[in-house]
Structures are given as C-alpha cells and as structure tokens.
Amino acid sequence: MGKLIDIPIVVESGQKYKTSQGVTAIKDGIKSSGQDHERLPKPKWLRIVNHTTPAYSQVKEQVQKHRLATVCEEAKCPNISECWSHGTATIMLMGAVCTRACRFCSVDTGNPHGWLDAEEPENTAETVALMNLDYVVLTSVNRDDLPDGGANHYAKTIRAIKKRSPRTKVEALTPDFQGSERDVAVLLDSGVDVFAQNVETVERLTHPVRDNRAGYQQTLNVLAFAKKYRPDVLTKTSLMLGLGETDEEIIQTMDDLRTHHVDILTLGQYLQPTKNHLPIARYVTPETFSELRQIGLKKGFFEVASGPLVRSSYRADRVFKRDNLGLDV
C-alpha cells in the first residue's frame, strides 16, 4: 500500500473553514457574494516594486519561528516586500481571526471563543529583540469575544518588549475596545509611545464600510480620551480614500480629528482585496495626496503621511520622527 501524502486544502475567498484552534472562520472576512463588480483599471502610479533582500528573509524567518501573525500578510498589504526588506514588520496580536467583518478588510472573520496564545507576549518581545528594532508596530484583530477586548494582552506584550528592548519605541494600532475608557487606559499605562485607532473613512460612509459595531464618533471619542488620559502619548489615525468620499468630506474629517486632539494622520488609497469586498470608487492622484498632506499640516497635525500606497503603519518610525521624505509623492 502506497504512502499517504498530505495535500494542503485550499480555502477559497469567502468560504468557511476551521482554523487550527477549531474556530469556524470565513476566509478573507466577507462571504462570497457570487458577483464580480467591474473594476477600474489600475493607474500607473500604483505599480508595486517587489524587494527581495536578506533582511526580508530574516523577518520572514522570525515571524514563522515564533508563530506570529502579521497584518502585512493577513491584510495583503502592498508594501510587505519593502517593509520586510528594511527589517520592519507590523505584528498582529491575538490571532488571525477577527470578530468583525469590515467590508474593506481581508482578515478572516469568526469567533475565537476567548482563545489566546499565552506565550505570545514573550515570543513577540523575543522577536523584537532579535530583530534589533528601533520601532515596532503592534496591531490586532478585534476581539469582542474577550471581556476587555484584549487590552491586557496588549499591555503584557508592550511591557515584555520594553523590558527586553527598553529603547524600542512601540506603536499600538488597536481595536476600539467598544469605546471602553477603562480598557483603553489599561493599554495606555503599559508604556506605549504611540496610540492609534483608525477612523478608516468619512462619517457618511462609516456604516457601509465598517462593521456595525464600529462607529465614527466612537473612534473619535477613544482617541480624545487617550490624549486626555496620557498627553505624552502621540495619537494617530488613518483614512482610506477612494471609497466614494468627497474632498470636502476628507477635510471635514481632518477638522473632526483635530478637534479630538489627534496628532498624526495617514492617508492612503483603498485597494479592493477580493471581488467580495467593496469596489473602488476612484483612484486618487499622487498630486491630490500631496495637496491633502499640506492641508493637514496647516490644520496642526504633528505629521501627515499621504500617498497612494501609504498604510497606517507604513514607515511609522519615520513618521514618528517627522521624517516624511518621499511619502507625499
């Protein structure tokens, strides 16, 4: 009798499957609609140059060795080769299954039923130390199945990083914790340097773009509380363009963010990850991104990173230092 061969099962986008923890999840977050929207032709300025360097291989090796999920992979980020080739990565905590289903995001959706990797804080700290990072971005899926939304897990991870790598700056791109100030405070007391929570889109488009449990005002309130509670911590948010918003709505969102004391803003082009996700309404030109950056700076943002391929954590270390060279062209 011949030897049995393990054949990997390929899960199609929009289909249900079981994770290694036994969680039922939907691949890429959105159920298959059976429809294929007509896509706008991609403009030449959105061409992505792949970088392959020893640093890229080193980051990939460390991520796999310590069983870390990265938003670079899970969210199909267009900048993965560039960032990894520069020895940086955005680490995604608390697994790769999100309890929410935002219609722009390709992270898998399901209910982890309270599962957490207890070794993740120390594994993450070890990886950051081995990479010798000056700056690290931590993000996560939403974990509405946890009483604190994962705030204590974030805090443990940040403290572990600071203990092993005290000079490393830590940015936390977090869920909204359902607006709980208590949970946000737990994270802010961990020694984090930058607190980020993404508003994602303009107020009018919040409901069709984000999960119903998210809210425009809820995000603004979380960011305002963070600044009030810890004035020394920089606050940050991100806005995707090309979902049907107007330039006037973008500027109004800037005003709302400044009213709520947000320090840093990133602006980037929305890219449709699969045919089941929201279609692209328009491609915003590099010139418009550059103009919006100047408008934002005049409104008093500490920094505005603005460009077609900019994502919330893209070159975050340079944005933190106000070294935004090349991000607005």
UniProtKB/Swiss-Prot annotation:
Pfam families: Radical_SAM. The keyword Metal-binding applies. Belongs to the radical SAM superfamily. Lipoyl synthase family. This is Lipoyl synthase. It comes from the Bacteria. InterPro entries: Aldolase_TIM, Elp3/MiaA/NifB-like_rSAM, Lipoyl_synth, rSAM. Its main location: cytoplasm. Binds 2 [4Fe-4S] clusters per subunit. One cluster is coordinated with 3 cysteines and an exchangeable S-adenosyl-L-methionine. GO terms for cellular component: cytoplasm. It is an enzyme of class 2 (transferase). It catalyses: [[Fe-S] cluster scaffold protein carrying a second [4Fe-4S](2+) cluster] + N(6)-octanoyl-L-lysyl-[protein] + 2 oxidized [2Fe-2S]-[ferredoxin] + 2 S-adenosyl-L-methionine + 4 H(+) = [[Fe-S] cluster scaffold protein] + N(6)-[(R)-dihydrolipoyl]-L-lysyl-[protein] + 4 Fe(3+) + 2 hydrogen sulfide + 2 5'-deoxyadenosine + 2 L-methionine + 2 reduced [2Fe-2S]-[ferredoxin]. Its cofactor is [4Fe-4S] cluster. Residues 83-303 form the Radical SAM core domain. The lineage of its organism: Bacteria, Pseudomonadati, Pseudomonadota, Gammaproteobacteria, Legionellales. Its EC number is 2.8.1.8. It is found in: Cytoplasm. It comes from Legionella pneumophila subsp. pneumophila (strain Philadelphia 1 / ATCC 33152 / DSM 7513). Keywords: 4Fe-4S, Cytoplasm, Iron, Iron-sulfur, Metal-binding, S-adenosyl-L-methionine, Transferase. The keyword S-adenosyl-L-methionine applies. SMART domains: Elp3. [4Fe-4S] cluster 2 binds at C98, C102, C105.
